[in-house]
Amino acid sequence: MLMQRRYLQVKDLPPRPDPVTGLPRPPRARGFIGPDVPKDVSLFRERDPALQPSPPPGQSPVLVWYRESRRGAVIAAVMIVLLAAGIASLTRGTAWIMHAKYWGVWAFLAVALVVVYFFFRGGCYSAGADWVARGKKWVKVYDLVKVTSRSYPGGPGVYLRDSGGRTLRFKFVDLSSDRMLWDLTYNGILHSVIAGGARTNDMLRRTLALPYPEPDEGSDS
């Protein structure tokens, strides 16, 4: 069954937020899959203001940022290692838990615990009114020339390239760690596609339910 195309005119785009104040805030965007929890009550996000990242050189201030807290990283690491231990029990039985000859399994699980912890702690996402960053890599979301969705290890994600040649990749689940982070990024993508003609693919349009630019009068499309 083919889905009917939705179209959007440039004049109907949501306004761009002010670079300094971030107002008006972009509307709630489609495709958000994270927990819509206020950041001041979330147990899984870092709250230490000293760890807030700086904006990219010459760009507008940071309006929102997200990094997994130590507690959140520990919980995630323990859950993944317990899952791995459960799989090991299904394939090897439970003898490995106490038997010395299976020390290699314990060593693997210990290493996995550390690796997963630092994996979750290492990702820091931030956004201003017109840019989004992962660590030191960033793009201007209102100047995107290419926005495509791809399958990455751990889930589907998006590839962004702006007019300055900067590129950024992230998984949708990562950017869904914070509602405002998602809304700011989506609004920029929407403007780039509708007003700027950024190149997209079918997977992105399906995932984010992106509308198409309103065709010119007399166009056959």
Predicted segments with their positions:
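N-terminal membrane-targeting/pre-transmembrane regions
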Residues: 1-93, 217-221
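Acidic surface patches and DE-rich sequence motifs
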Residues: 18, 128, 162
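Hydrophobic, well-ordered secondary-structure segments
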Residues: 55, 83-93, 109-111, 116, ...
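Hydrophobic alpha-helical transmembrane segments
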Residues: 72-76, 94-109
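N-terminal transmembrane hairpin
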Residues: 81, 88, 95-101, 123-124, ...
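Conserved beta-hairpin
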Residues: 103-150
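Acidic, Ser/Thr-rich low-complexity segments on the non-lumenal side of membrane proteins
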Residues: 134-176
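A membrane-cytosol interface segment of integral membrane proteins
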Residues: 163-221
